[in-house]
Curated annotation (Swiss-Prot):
One of its GO terms (cellular component) is plasma membrane. It is an enzyme of class 3 (hydrolase). It comes from Gallus gallus (Chicken). It is a lipid-anchor. This is Acyl-coenzyme A thioesterase MBLAC2. PANTHER family: ACYL-COENZYME A THIOESTERASE MBLAC2, METALLO-BETA-LACTAMASE DOMAIN-CONTAINING.
């Protein structure tokens, strides 16, 4: 299967494209965002990596500027290293991730990447004989380590890194202040927020949600482009964040701890910590 078959995209205007993996039919299917700038293009999250995303972008003509001068530099940023977001980083020359998860990416740690994929989720295998049990996130050396407050410049567009741990220890959002757009990764999406994985932390998540609410209160976000499911606006962002905070009491922390223990055992059985096998 070619990259052109595996991926599909939808233009959203203002140089932003929404890309998905067509034959990965799962709640874990991550949204991939392409943001085009005057000097650099940016991919936010990279999917599973079963087919080359850069090949798709080139074949679909998404990297060629209007003047036909040739492709601009391309940077791939992972909002966190979970497998559905980081598997495709292997196909990029320039890769950025938050420093808290850089070591996991470098060693191909499929425990921290929470790699969990089944044959039934991949409705059309990328090649004959492919099996989900052979899938892993390979080691990738990041070319840039991100920190809170870093700015990724695309020339005519600036994206500010917000370190928002909770879902994972290195989770980030990218904030386009000028256009009031938040690329939220898995920090928040229109669904149940997951805080029971290895390296999740409820207390950190509460603080991150408070920051999300502050963005809305200050009028700094109008549109959220999340890591999963559909886009939504500021009012929904505020409600999702406030709802999480309201439920994050002692009972929730206890139940989350139990779920994390179960998830950790399951992930240890399917993935060797610190390896990509």
């Amino acid at each position: 299967m070619s990259a052109l078959e595996w991926f599909a995209h939808k233009p959203l205007g203002s140089g932003i494209f929404w890309i998905q993996e067509r034959f990965y039919e799962s709640g874990n299917r991550a949204n991939i965002w392409l943001v085009r700038g005057s000097q650099r293009d940016l991919v936010i999250d990279a999917g599973l990596g079963l087919r080359s995303l850069p090949d798709y972008l080139r074949a679909a003509g998404l990297l060629a500027p209007p003047d036909g001068a040739g492709p601009r530099p391309l940077l791939a940023v992972a909002t966190h290293v979970h497998f559905d977001h980081s598997g495709g980083l292997q196909h990029f020359e320039e890769v950025a991730v938050h420093s808290a998860e850089a070591a996991a990416l470098l060693r191909g740690d499929n425990y921290e990447a929470v790699t969990w994929l089944s044959d039934r989720e991949v409705t059309r295998p990328p090649r004959p004989g492919w099996r989900a049990r052979h899938f892993c996130v390979p080691p990738v050396r990041p070319s840039r380590l991100l920190q809170e407050g870093d700015v990724i410049s695309l020339g005519d567009r600036q994206l500010t890194v917000m370190h928002m741990p909770g879902h994972s220890r290195g989770s980030i959002c990218l904030h386009d202040r000028e256009h009031k757009i938040l690329f939220s990764g898995d920090v928040v999406y229109d669904g149940s927020m997951i805080d029971w994985l290895p390296y999740s932390n409820v207390s950190d998540y509460v603080v991150s949600c408070q920051r999300l609410m502050e963005l809305v209160d200050r009028g700094l976000v109008e549109k959220v482009l999340p890591g999963h499911f559909n886009m939504f606006g500021a009012e929904r962002l505020y409600r999702l964040a406030s709802n999480y905070i309201s439920k994050a009491g002692i009972c929730h922390k206890v139940s989350t701890c139990a779920m994390r223990s179960i998830a950790s055992i399951a992930l240890h059985l399917t993935n060797s910590r610190g390896t990509s096998s």
